[in-house]
Amino acid sequence: MNVPVGHLRNVQVLGIDAGGTMTDTFFVDQDGDFVVGKAQSTPQNEALGLIASSEDGLANWGMSLHEALAQLQTGVYSGTAMLNRVVQRKGLKCGLIVNRGMEDFHRMGRAVQSHLGYAYEDRIHLNTHRYDPPLVPRHLTRGVVERTDMIGTQVIPLREDTARDAARDLIAADAEGIVISLLHSYKNPENERRVRDIVLEEVEKSGKKIPVFASADYYPVRKETHRTNTTILEGYAAEPSRQTLSKISNAFKERGTKFDFRVMATHGGTISWKAKELARTIVSGPIGGVIGAKYLGEVLGYKNIACSDIGGTSFDVALITQGEMTIKNDPDMARLVLSLPLVAMDSVGAGAGSFIRLDPYTRAIKLGPDSAGYRVGVCWKESGIETVTISDCHMVLGYLNPDNFLGGAVKLDRQRSVDAIKAQIADPLGLSVEDAAAGVIELLDSDLRDYLRSMISGKGYSPASFVCFSYGGAGPVHTYGYTEGLGFEDVIVPAWAAGFSAFGCAAADFEYRYDKSLDINMPTETPDTDKEKAAATLQAAWEELTKNVLEEFKLNGYSADQVTLQPGYRMQYRGQLNDLEIESPLAQAHTAADWDQLTDAFNATYGRVYAASARSPELGYSVTGAIMRGMVPIPKPKIPKEPEEGETPPESAKIGTRKFYRKKRWVDAQLYHMESLRPGNRVMGPAVIESDATTFVVPDGFETWLDGHRLFHLREV
């Protein structure tokens, strides 16, 4: 929320979303008021984009960067740099130590990894189906003699000479990191930790500085490929990202900050960039938007929310049901299966920068998945882009103001878009330029609408039970298109949609989370003594994980009494394949009555996620994992609340008209300045509401009104 420039303020919190296209910053002052900044991302040196975005936002408050940064108490970063490093396979040169005889399992991977992310037609075509190289090549993989079975019994003792030989080989091969992942070490880590100690001894003897990562220290969870991939990421991608985050933190310290940046983690909390488990920040960017939606929902009383985020490269969707996010425990990213707690999201490679091509054989239009990213499209002359993008279609159809992209910092050329679409799309299809561009947008909106519908209905819900939040820099441009006809209870576009993920970062607690796999199986009719044993096993795991959580906070200057602990567990009905994450109703578990409370909480959650009739307590229960979360609250942004005025927008909000093409005809769309609209104002389509950072399109057949929280409500008329 922008407040008068002369207002004395103390800036406290900075949220950052460094996306592939734009870098958003979100500043919060002592009153909870906030301002959003936006600038093009600078992948070569992220700090440059962050500083430019910060200066853009602070200009609205009449503050200098140095003045604001000196006041800041904390800052949260989210971005995609680590994920991009993994996707492009540009990580550190790592070595891998596994059981002898298992040296090939990493490069073989799980079968699903061979086709993750591919459309069906690409999977079966020899020229389009690529097999990504493993993170660690075979020649940097070594085996040691050792075997621990699935219940944790040492069947073959460790032959330490094989571990020393493996360590020396990898050190001699100039490995920049060494990863150790032995079978079933999550059940009994003794041998794996002994191998770790041997490797550390050999590294010290060599005089080199090589980090060593044992899976038992980082991800003591079942599923060998998932656990190994995730531990490798700590060396392969997290360590280089740690250096990037260090540079960003230092760049801001040189300009006045006195704190270390925190990073948005996959589970929805924030952790220090110095944290041991940094791989869990691999996909921090889109998570911020879901956290922001959850926080906004809590403040305003929305329980069921469909989160939709369109940026320059992707369309990300997540569901919040009854105020809770779903956490996946074994997600896939960059065509790898991983063992990370991840806010459940689905993503499509379709954003404002997505390239548009014609299939040379079928003449069908193909959108993405690759993107122009921060280079926008052909419309930006300096981009060097020659293939048309979605943004070029926006230009042709009159959606965007070529003189107001990023507030005029980037000048776009509509005629370049017209010429490129004519040559690449319109002429080959025998269409006019306008119809070709409109057809692309209709195809994109249809794809996104079907995707959103299937995600909601596939989980057994109806869109009528959900409020849809639309955000991201390109979200408000397409909101009408991908929500039309779905029947949402309400469709909401925040006025700060362009910086919504950064807003979510600013609203996220400082939180560490540790997980551990368990195998507790309890039939229905169980004596109290067995229930007590099960509760004790879970309690022991919680206590072990609590030490890890408190140690992380201690490194960041927080004592145990400042940390709020929240235990959790993963449970399923015996014989079923999928478990659910449950927040424990108890701080500790010791008695049979405690066990019954844990199963009652699971039954209630199961009925909410699926259906009450699907509950099957007669099968008994399995606890598959223990979870411990520790949280320290931070100042959060205040949701604005302004008095509502009349329905008619002030004349000062009108900034002219522009030709707008839809449904095979040109119309004159009324243009509005977003920040000049007042709460209570109602806008009928066709209209385009412009801000420096985003554009909200309201076509004919739709209307929107602005409430006192500066949220636009869109509905069909």
UniProtKB/Swiss-Prot annotation:
**E.C. designation(s):** 6.4.1.6
What does the entry report about how pH modulates activity? Optimum pH is 7.6.
Q: Name one GO cellular component term.
A: cytosol
Q: Which Pfam families match?
A: Hydant_A_C (PF19278), Hydant_A_N (PF05378), Hydantoinase_A (PF01968)
Q: How does it assemble?
A: Heterohexamer of two alpha, two beta and two gamma subunits.
Reaction(s) the record says it catalyses:
acetone + hydrogencarbonate + 2 ATP + 3 H2O = acetoacetate + 2 AMP + 4 phosphate + 4 H(+)
**What name does the UniProt record give this protein?**
Acetone carboxylase beta subunit
What InterPro entries has UniProt attached to this entry? ACX-like_C, ATPase_NBD, Hydant_A_N, Hydantoinase_A, Oxoprolinase-like
- Cofactor note as given: Zn(2+). The heterohexamer contains tightly bound iron, manganese and zinc ions.
Cofactors named for this entry: Fe cation; Mg(2+); Zn(2+)
Q: Which cysteines are joined by disulfide bonds?
A: none
Q: What does this protein do?
A: Catalyzes the carboxylation of acetone to form acetoacetate. Has a reduced activity on butanone, and no activity on 2-pentatone, 3-pentatone, 2-hexanone, chloroacetone, pyruvate, phosphoenolpyruvate, acetaldehyde, propionaldehyde and propylene oxide.
**Assigned protein family:** Belongs to the oxoprolinase family.
Gene Ontology BP terms: cellular detoxification of acetone; glutathione metabolic process
